[in-house]
């Protein structure tokens, strides 16, 4: 291939993958894209004569697609990208070329860029980066973020300017992403590959209600056009932005030498998991805005800033097998079984392959050396085989078209569906097993005495034909199992506990009953919305899909799934037998979903409360449920709209932000007082001794 042909091929590939990164589903990793772009840059530097026309190395990003449903609007000031370096030698070269009295270092967040235009303190526009000159108008979606105020609030030191563009990154932090994907998996929905895709997709939703469902956050990292605002430094600009009520990174640091910059690069390379969000690099900026102006910019990036990109956290291991798991709604999910490997902070031995199409697309063979990456710090991802290490002993994996649990032929539920499912929903032991363990989980009946082994024993001992018989279990039934009986065949302590827990579960809230039924797509969020609207399971069964879809929190897909579920005879038998056994199928009068007996369901109504750090008597889920049971909103991030921050040990950045914004901080004792008596009146002191909380 000629040099000219290689240049054209690389240019086409870079443009293709950049378009997918911003407006579609990426096909390659960020590291692979960076390698493509770097090869193109190196080739252009060695052979400048091959560049014909515009090169993607000089472009900020692709222009918004012509088919976009969003209005295209010009930025007041061009919104540039950043150049990258990939090792300390390259960084040292940039520092030599860009001497400064003070540098600013900040974490490079892997999210979706946004440009906020405020005129006289009012939010006028929110735009995507677009091609750097023109972005898409996503104002309606931006307004759903708690971190983006409609109105800026000035101070004596930092009055609100006539006009200012504030640049930032919309993202989903690691903890929220894990919870969101777990919820989607529980509801049978497709999981997101990584937080960046989830955040970027959320900001380009046509319906802002869909955007609002995702736990989006914002960190501001720059300014564009401005009138009536002339900060001396980037650091001063961040102080002003924070004073106006917008979030800035708690990890930003001023340093005064190239050596200190390199120390920050080394530090964050060893502590990248300490940040609440995903980060793939460290951004270094010249702090002085006057010096920035003197240095200027190229057509795509400022000369006064650089991004040091850390290597992605990948590792090589051996693929031993590919197995197929059957979920509670019948979805067949292939997963890789690997030699255990420590990567991204934990040891992994399995990785999902999502569906048969994805499994075959990866091109892995049994016995392969494979490259894995922890995607989103939660889901191990198989990137592909290391073909150079193949010995010839590897063998292909043949995806069976039959259910590994019951032998029924697998098939997509509809044409074009990438997921294959076992249609034997009633009698497949694999589906029954996962349904039993799911209904026993904390998000449903919370029966801790019914684990995976116990569920397996109940099924394979012949004690349970399906979950409809669960609440009819007697001591003599459990004595037929190994999990709940002594060697002498008498009921053991676990069996006694199970019977007690089953009795308690009969009084569970209506929303928990709905979750326990394993209706496809119905998780706790949708179940709570339904339980607030309807009085009983029978009311829900009688409702039309259209009526249910009109409820906030119940999408059309969920509504249709519920309607379909109640048309199946054996599903109705579950409801009937549970009711006959004494399971409460109605919402108690005045009982808000999730509320405990005797709790005032309006005690915290209208309050937004954030919990951070470790509490002695509450885990994160219990604290959230306690707040919601009393009518409050349990938020994931601190903003001007936050009423209280509950700070346990190692509270970290959220505590600092709350203090900066003047949000009242509660220790655990004060939190318990709040749950008992509600918020203090306006004349009371709402703050507690935050000094006693470790940062």
Swiss-Prot record:
It is an enzyme of class 6 (ligase). It comes from Corynebacterium jeikeium (strain K411). Signal peptide: none annotated. Residues 599-688 form the BRCT domain. SUPFAM superfamilies: BRCT domain, DNA ligase/mRNA capping enzyme, catalytic domain, Nucleic acid-binding proteins, RuvA domain 2-like. Residues 52-71, 676-695 are annotated as: Disordered. NCBIfam families: dnlj, PRK07956.1. GO terms for biological process: DNA repair; DNA replication. This is DNA ligase. Zn(2+) binds at residues 403, 406, 422, 428. InterPro entries: BRCT_dom, BRCT_dom_sf, DisA/LigA_HHH, DNA_ligase, DNA_ligase_AS, DNAligase_adenylation, DNAligase_N, NA-bd_OB-fold. Disulfide bonds: none annotated. Its cofactor is Mg(2+); Mn(2+). HAMAP family: DNA_ligase_A. GO terms for molecular function: DNA ligase (NAD+) activity; metal ion binding. It catalyses: NAD(+) + (deoxyribonucleotide)n-3'-hydroxyl + 5'-phospho-(deoxyribonucleotide)m = (deoxyribonucleotide)n+m + AMP + beta-nicotinamide D-nucleotide. Residues 679-695 have a biased composition (Low complexity).
């Amino acid at each position: 291939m000629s040099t000219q042909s290689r240049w054209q091929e690389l240019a086409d590939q870079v443009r293709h993958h950049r378009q997918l990164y911003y407006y579609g589903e990426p096909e390659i990793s960020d590291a692979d894209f960076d390698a493509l772009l770097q090869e193109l840059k190196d080739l252009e530097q060695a052979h400048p004569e091959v560049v014909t026309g515009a090169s993607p190395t000089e472009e900020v990003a692709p222009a918004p697609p012509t088919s976009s449903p969003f209005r295209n609007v010009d930025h007041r000031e061009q919104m540039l990208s950043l150049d990258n370096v990939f090792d300390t030698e390259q960084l040292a070269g940039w520092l030599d070329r860009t001497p400064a009295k003070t540098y600013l270092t900040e974490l490079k967040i892997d999210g979706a860029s946004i440009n906020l235009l405020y005129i006289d303190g009012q939010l006028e526009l929110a735009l995507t980066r677009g091609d750097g000159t023109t972005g898409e108008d996503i104002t309606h979606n931006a307004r759903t973020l708690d971190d983006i105020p409609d109105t800026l609030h000035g101070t004596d030191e930092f009055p609100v300017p006539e006009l200012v563009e504030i640049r930032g990154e919309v993202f989903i932090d690691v903890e929220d992403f894990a919870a969101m994907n777990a919820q989607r998996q529980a509801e049978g929905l497709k999981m997101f590959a990584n937080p960046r895709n989830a955040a970027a997709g959320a900001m380009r939703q046509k319906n802002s209600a869909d955007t609002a469902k995702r736990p989006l956050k914002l960190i501001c990292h720059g300014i564009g056009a401005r009138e009536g605002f002339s900060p001396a430094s980037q650091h001063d600009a961040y102080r002003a932005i924070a004073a106006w009520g917008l979030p800035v990174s708690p990890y930003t640091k001023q340093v005064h030498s190239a050596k200190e910059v390199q120390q920050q690069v080394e530090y964050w390379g060893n502590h990248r998991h300490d940040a609440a969000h995903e980060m793939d690099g460290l951004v270094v900026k010249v702090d002085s805005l006057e010096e920035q102006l003197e240095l200027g910019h190229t057509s795509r990036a400022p000369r006064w800033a650089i991004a040091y990109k850390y290597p992605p956290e990948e590792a090589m291991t051996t693929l031993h097998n590919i197995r197929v798991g059957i979920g509670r709604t019948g979805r067949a999910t292939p997963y890789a079984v690997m030699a255990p490997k420590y990567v991204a902070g934990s040891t992994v031995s399995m990785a999902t392959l999502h569906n048969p199409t994805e499994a075959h697309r990866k091109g892995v063979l049994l016995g392969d050396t494979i490259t894995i990456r922890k995607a989103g710090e939660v889901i191990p991802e198989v990137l592909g085989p290391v073909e150079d290490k193949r010995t010839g002993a590897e063998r292909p994996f043949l995806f069976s078209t039959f259910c590994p649990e019951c032998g029924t032929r697998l098939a997509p539920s509809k044409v074009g569906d990438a997921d294959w499912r076992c249609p034997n929903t009633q009698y497949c032991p694999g589906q029954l097993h996962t349904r039993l363990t799911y209904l026993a989980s904390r998000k449903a009946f919370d029966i801790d005495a019914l684990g995976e082994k116990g569920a397996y024993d109940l099924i394979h001992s012949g004690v349970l034909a399906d979950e409809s018989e669960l609440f009819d279990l007697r001591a003599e039934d459990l004595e037929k199992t190994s999990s709940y009986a002594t060697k002498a065949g008498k009921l053991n302590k676990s069996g006694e506990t199970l019977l007690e827990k089953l009795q308690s579960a009969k009084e569970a809230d209506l929303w928990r009953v709905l979750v326990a039924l394993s209706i496809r797509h119905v998780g706790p969020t949708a179940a709570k919305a339904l339980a607030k609207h309807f009085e009983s399971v029978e009311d829900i069964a009688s409702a039309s899909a259209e009526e249910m879809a009109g409820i906030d929190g119940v999408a059309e897909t969920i509504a249709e799934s519920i309607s379909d579920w109640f048309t199946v005879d054996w599903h109705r038998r579950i409801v009937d037998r549970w009711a006959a056994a004494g399971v409460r199928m109605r919402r108690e009068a005045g009982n808000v979903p999730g509320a405990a007996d005797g709790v005032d369901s309006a005690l915290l109504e209208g309050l937004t409360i954030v919990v951070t750090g470790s509490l002695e008597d509450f885990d994160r889920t219990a604290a959230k449920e306690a707040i919601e049971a009393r009518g409050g909103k349990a938020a994931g991030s601190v903003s001007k709209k936050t009423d209280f921050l509950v700070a346990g040990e190692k509270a970290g950045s959220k505590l600092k932000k709350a203090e900066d914004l003047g949000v009242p901080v509660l220790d655990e004792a004060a939190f318990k007082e709040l749950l008992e008596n509600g918020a203090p009146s306006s004349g009371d002191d709402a703050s507690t001794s935050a000094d006693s909380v470790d940062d």
